[in-house]
Amino acid sequence: IAAGCNIITTSNYYATPLILNGMGKKYNYLELTKVAIELAQKAVDSKNKNVMIAGSFPPINISFRPDLIPSNNQLIDFYSSISELYINNVDLILCETIASIQEAQIASKIALENFHRVWLSWTVRGIDFKLLPSKELLSDAVKNLSKTRIEYQLVNCAHADLTTEAIKILKEHTDNFGAYANSSIYDPSKDSLENYESVDEIHHHHSNEINCSDYLKHVTECIALGAKVVGGCFTTRPE
């Protein structure tokens, strides 16, 4: 907030029942989500600025792994339960790092049933900005959700250079788009894709960290392309 943002996101990205159970943690995801809401509200109140709070609808399981998404009923129960906590406590819902059309449809349906303002952010398949981790085309995904009243469609948690390319696809199918990338760029000199077993490995092993000025160049390009929302994701910092 001190650095100038006008939206912050609740920090409950990994507070999901499947992730906590997989880590052997005894914490309750709903209790952790309540804490995340309270911390976001305190941050906004302490700065006395006009800053919105986005309630996070995170992936229910490990990021970039749509193959680990459970049944539709489990997704519905998860998003419905955190929706109840967000009502009257956040300004909008952000369905983020969405890896498949199935996940997007369920998360957005629950969000739209309970909130007026809903944003949805896709992520891409490793180094291929044209695909979701599910191997579905990003263009098909954007077109599918364009039929709803989602306010903005975004791309997040991908290399800054690939994110810039991905929003060109968003631009073809919606006027309201944006991005919040990682502070990294794709490094083609790293091992070939065949050496990695999962999309998650591809995502993190083909990266070179970039500094603030280099990140700014990518954000500026996104704005020039027409992005109406820009920000930062993995490893970005206030500066």
Where in this protein do the model-derived segments appear?
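Domain-level signal for soluble alpha/beta catalytic cores
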Residues: I1-E239
